[in-house]
Curated annotation (Swiss-Prot):
A GO-annotated cellular component: cytosolic large ribosomal subunit
Primary role: This is one of the proteins that bind and probably mediate the attachment of the 5S RNA into the large ribosomal subunit, where it forms part of the central protuberance.
Gene designation: rplR
PANTHER family assigned: 39S RIBOSOMAL PROTEIN L18, MITOCHONDRIAL, LARGE RIBOSOMAL SUBUNIT PROTEIN UL18M
Classification of source organism: Bacteria, Pseudomonadati, Chlamydiota, Chlamydiia, Chlamydiales
Top-rank taxon: Bacteria
Subunit architecture: Part of the 50S ribosomal subunit; part of the 5S rRNA/L5/L18/L25 subcomplex. Contacts the 5S and 23S rRNAs.
Species for this entry: Chlamydia pneumoniae (Chlamydophila pneumoniae)
Designated name of the protein: Large ribosomal subunit protein uL18
InterPro entries: Ribosomal_uL18_bac-type (IPR004389), Ribosomal_uL18_bac/euk (IPR005484)
């Protein structure tokens, strides 16, 4: 019998793989990946054809630390969404594929998506 912690992490990994098997990022339409931990939020634009991160923002970045955006809440998530949209526009990207990973499209994940849409990204 496996521990509940091992089972929980295994199920989380399976959910992420289930979502990602249908999502592929390309140079013209990268994958917008959202990862949240117990303390922080990470948002990345990823080109899966070459396996490279094109742009990223998080609650750990210097810009957000100087502005006091270090907490993990919905307001900060929306700001991160608008920041990643600005970085995407600097790279001449306007369309992305949204990757929620193993998380429900609810709360922080949906606020990142709303912020990115308000910033001009389409998905």
């Amino acid at each position: 019998m496996e521990s509940s912690l091992c089972k929980k992490s295994l199920m989380k990994r399976r959910r992420a793989l289930r979502v990602r098997k249908v999502l592929k990022g390309s140079p013209t339409k990268p994958r917008l990946s959202v990862v949240k931990t117990n303390k922080h939020i990470y948002v990345q634009l990823i080109d899966d054809s070459i396996g490279k991160t094109l742009a990223s923002v998080s609650t750990l970045s210097k810009l957000n630390k100087s502005q006091g955006l270090t907490k993990k809440n919905q307001e900060v998530a929306k700001v991160l969404g608008t920041q990643i949209a600005e970085l995407g526009k600097n790279l001449q990207l306007d369309r992305v594929v949204f990757d929620r990973g193993p998380f429900k499209y609810h709360g922080i994940v949906s606020m990142v998506a709303d912020g990115a849409r308000e910033g001009g990204l389409q998905f």
